[in-house]
A protein has these predicted regions:
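Intrinsic-disorder/low-complexity signal
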Residues: 43-167
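Extracellular calcium-associated, cysteine-rich motifs in secreted modular proteins
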Residues: 1-51
Length: 167
């Protein structure tokens, strides 16, 4: 398989990715973090993993957070569209996919190689549920051998966080 790399990564204003990895012990399921620093996010937790993976996790059990990914031709993965022609697949959509209290959305690339171009990842709070605002979330991503992530604070249903990845 050809190597996969992110040539450029864009973040919303005031958001930074944590590129350093400090092992904290065994993998903790449902947090979108590479806890054991082996280059994989939430492996062994019932989620699919791939060379291109975008995952968001949140702790408020009644909240709904949406992870949407658009590919270079504009096809979108979201709660209504679970696959694109370019090979993106919505692997897990919580809480509707029976997530056993671990709220995650997970999008992976099932194709051998990504379509070249810009991928846009949008994370938004759909419903805070019975919890109070803000809702805390963590966005983790993997492109090839590069794994990173950031903590997010979602303050309202009008707010969204957009990230761009040039592959």
């Amino acid at each position: 398989m050809p190597p996969v790399e992110a040539k450029h990564v864009g973040t919303p204003s005031g958001v930074w990715f944590d590129e350093a990895c400090t092992p904290t012990g065994p993998e903790v399921c449902g947090n979108a973090i590479d806890d054991n620093c082996n280059g994989l996010i939430d492996e062994g937790c019932g989620l699919s993993i791939a060379r291109v993976q975008f995952e968001v996790a949140w702790s408020e059990p009644t909240a709904t957070v949406e992870l949407a990914v658009s590919d270079p031709v504009g096809d979108v993965i979201d709660s209504s569209h679970r696959a694109t022609r370019s090979g993106l697949k919505l692997d897990k959509k919580c809480p509707q996919d029976g997530c056993s209290g671990q709220n995650v959305d997970n999008v992976i690339l099932v194709a051998d190689a990504p379509m070249p171009g810009q991928y846009t990842v949008t994370i938004r709070l759909v419903d805070p549920g019975k919890g109070s605002l803000p809702v805390k979330a963590h966005f983790g991503w993997r492109v090839g051998d590069r794994v990173s992530g950031t903590n997010l604070t979602l303050r309202s249903t009008d707010e969204k966080k957009d990230f761009s990845f040039e592959l």
